[in-house]
């Protein structure tokens, strides 16, 4: 399972229907939160994502609309009896902010919280995946992130295994797990009976940024790109000045990168009643695009074989 829940899709100002930035990724039951704007914990409750399985928070930058939800969330999890440690990753300043988060409210946490500062190119290793930090272009030190699953084993060739003398049963399982087995007086290796490794899935989260090279390169052939799409193209000058992106700019990046699906988020409050200008400008360039809405969910399937 790889499920994306958009908890907050608004721009710098929250609106009546958009919370500040927060995206939850549920990968095989492990929860990872990318940014955590004000009110994120309530959005988690509304979306029924759960929170106690949250392993890590990846902060793109320390503008208030991307991190103010963290203190309340960590307090709630403490009240609910959390014991597992929580990791907070982000750019320069993350350790200092983490200590501040722990001090707010004057309560004793029942679990450990660790802050780790990342630089572009740094990799956080998980079980079956990595998260790579990307250099982005915003008005303060900022990072994007690429979640990259490890390749999956190729398909098991039962007929070939039998032909090599391996009897059906436990030895099949060992081969599928990558272990050589002995059968008929000889060693049979996994590569003899397993097909070509199959690619895992890749999700890229830009955070707030201008269109930039690092996000483009990380997004090549990605399954999903979640990108700052704050403005319609008519606001191009202001987007450049404020270090955000327009829908058309992001669509062009997605097209060049060959992504499978594009989701625009961090939608400016000027589009509270109508996101059609953003959608129209992006679809001129790239068809498979969605303007995110709060509590929207996406399931990311494996690629067809």
UniProtKB/Swiss-Prot annotation:
Listed GO MF terms? 3'-tRNA processing endoribonuclease activity; zinc ion binding
- Gene3D superfamilies (alphabetical): Ribonuclease Z/Hydroxyacylglutathione hydrolase-like (3.60.15.10)
What does this protein's record comment on cofactor binding? Answer: Binds 2 Zn(2+) ions.
Top-level taxon of origin = Archaea
* Residues the entry annotates as binding Zn(2+) 2: 65-66, 208, 266
Q: Does the keyword RNA-binding apply?
A: no
E.C. number, please? 3.1.26.11
Keyword field: Endonuclease, Hydrolase, Metal-binding, Nuclease, tRNA processing, Zinc
Required cofactor(s): Zn(2+)
Q: What class of enzyme is it?
A: hydrolase
Active-site residues from the entry:
65 (proton acceptor)
Annotated residues for binding of Zn(2+) 1: 61, 63, 138, 208
The reaction(s) annotated as catalysed by this protein in its Swiss-Prot or TrEMBL entry are:
Endonucleolytic cleavage of RNA, removing extra 3' nucleotides from tRNA precursor, generating 3' termini of tRNAs. A 3'-hydroxy group is left at the tRNA terminus and a 5'-phosphoryl group is left at the trailer molecule
State the family named in the UniProt similarity comment for this chain. Answer: Belongs to the RNase Z family.
PANTHER family attached to this UniProt entry: ZINC PHOSPHODIESTERASE ELAC PROTEIN 1 (PTHR46018:SF2)
Q: What role does this protein play?
A: Zinc phosphodiesterase, which displays some tRNA 3'-processing endonuclease activity. Probably involved in tRNA maturation, by removing a 3'-trailer from precursor tRNA.
Question: How is the quaternary structure described?
Answer: Homodimer.
What name does this protein carry?
A: Ribonuclease Z
Gene name of the encoded protein: rnz
